[in-house]
Amino acid sequence: MSNMPDQRRGPWSAGEDQRLIKLVKDLGPGNWVNVARILGTRTPKQCRERWHQNLKPGLNHGPMTQEEAAIIVREVDLKGPRWADIARKLQGRSDNAVKNYWNGLNNRKKNQLRRQSAPRRVSASDVLRSSPGQLPRAHMQRPIRYPQDIYTGSRRPSSPSSFNDSLHHRVHESIEWFPSRPQQQQQQQQQQARCTTPFTSFYPPSHAFPTTDGYQDGSDGPTGSTLRLLTPPTSRRLAPFSTLPSPTTSSIGDLDEFDRRQLAAFAPPAAYRRPSLPFPQQSSMGYLPSATEYLPTAPSSPIALIQRDEKNHARIPVTSLLCS
């Protein structure tokens, strides 16, 4: 046993085949132990199988004929996979060749059944060449895939009426998100009322705040026609100069020269006067009047202002007027 060569795996080379044929001719086809010992690269079993399956004279390596295929099918149905017995009934066929043919035949049958059971794919050329009544049966019997319903989780509706009802429900629900035009206008009016109510309650329209940062009609100094008067942000208006509180006549004599010049600076010349406008109407936006709606007509002099206003207004010091 120590002289037995190690088993070598893999395909046989051409040199090994030539040496095996020569050794079998010299030693005989039954002395496989000595053949393997002399060959030195294969075991006795490998040498025997190689000779009977591939190198034996008289073996037919061509394709199987129809008569041979029928014999193989009949013998396998009767006896099962007894490849050596089946090979003896065939002239020049080895048991390994019979086994390989049977396995290949089974694989071809399985692939054919798999192709027949699979649905046929219809190409664009087949559709153009055939009429609507001649379409393949597999294409006509393909089930329709409905989109999954997000409400019920099902893909196929139970009936056409239920499908129409669910569609109508989705459309009606989507329309409810968009309010009608009268409802939208009413919501805008309520929102405008909420925005303007706090300012109008705290700041009446007649209240004004004199500033000296700019003047109407592009004037560059205190000699401009009108003093810019600021109101709350919701309604920028120019209040008439006559609405300002009037100083008392007793306080006129207490004014020094500086106060008199300051008071006279607020009286524009008569050339820049403009006629008073009536009470402003609501603008197109509903609550933002134009800045030119209140254009005052100032008196010609501070003395005339005092004489006119002391009859109608409360008497307050002039210093409070200048400080405000």
UniProtKB/Swiss-Prot annotation:
Record-level Gene Ontology MF annotations: DNA-binding transcription factor activity, RNA polymerase II-specific; RNA polymerase II cis-regulatory region sequence-specific DNA binding
Residue stretches of biased makeup (Low complexity): 183-192, 222-231
The HTH myb-type domain, residue ranges: 4-59, 60-110
Gene expressing this chain: rca-1
Entries under Pfam families matching the protein: Myb_DNA-binding
Subcellular location: Nucleus
Alphabetized UniProt keyword annotations: DNA-binding, Nucleus, Repeat
Protein known as: Myb-like DNA-binding protein myb-1
